[in-house]
Regions:
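Short, charged/polar connector segments at secondary-structure boundaries
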Residues: 1-120, 124, 130-131
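Short hydrophobic alpha-helical runs that function as membrane-insertion/retention elements
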Residues: 118, 136-141
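Conserved small/polar residues in nucleotide/adenosyl-binding loops
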Residues: 149-150
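Nucleic-acid processing machinery
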Residues: 145
Length: 151
């Protein structure tokens, strides 16, 4: 895949993200990924249990661990940043790797809470794979342990 082809794919994914955001905003819904740290608020959890590396269904990934980059993605993890951004360049490089011999090899890191997953590391890898129609993604998973589960 050439750089020009990767840029074309990024622009298509960007339009999908913009369209999704507009649709969700029109319905009065949050257009960005959910944020686990905000959901947990204060003291709901007593830690995380390492579950290991699993293939998880992409449809169960609903958010991110922390709020740091939520405005870079639509709720469905399509990109929202300008094509000239460093973010876009990295997304396009992953696109080229995915379509080339190299592939996307490294698992993402995510947290599982109440059956849903929240990405800590690997948002762009998830975005590229989802854009290309992947249904599962390798992930290092940590399960959030709620206070009442430890009693």
């Amino acid at each position: 895949m050439t750089v020009a082809e990767a840029e074309s794919e990024y622009l298509k994914a960007l339009r999908l993200g913009q369209k999704e955001c507009a649709m969700l905003q029109g319905k009065g819904q949050n257009p960005f990924p959910l944020v686990l740290d905000q959901i947990l608020g204060g003291g709901v959890s007593e830690g995380a249990q390492d579950i290991g590396t699993l293939e998880i269904p992409i449809e169960r990934i609903v958010g991110v661990k922390s709020a740091g980059r939520i405005s870079a993605f639509s709720a469905g993890f399509f990109p929202l940043l300008d094509c000239e951004s460093e973010f876009a360049m990295k997304w396009m490089a992953l696109c080229q790797a995915h379509q080339g011999d190299e592939g996307i090899r490294d698992p993402i890191i995510c947290y599982e809470y109440l059956g849903n997953f929240y990405v800590q590391e690997g948002n762009k890898r998830l975005s590229v794979l989802k854009y290309y129609g992947a249904t599962r993604i390798p992930s290092v998973v940590y399960r959030i342990v709620r206070s009442e589960e430890r009693r």
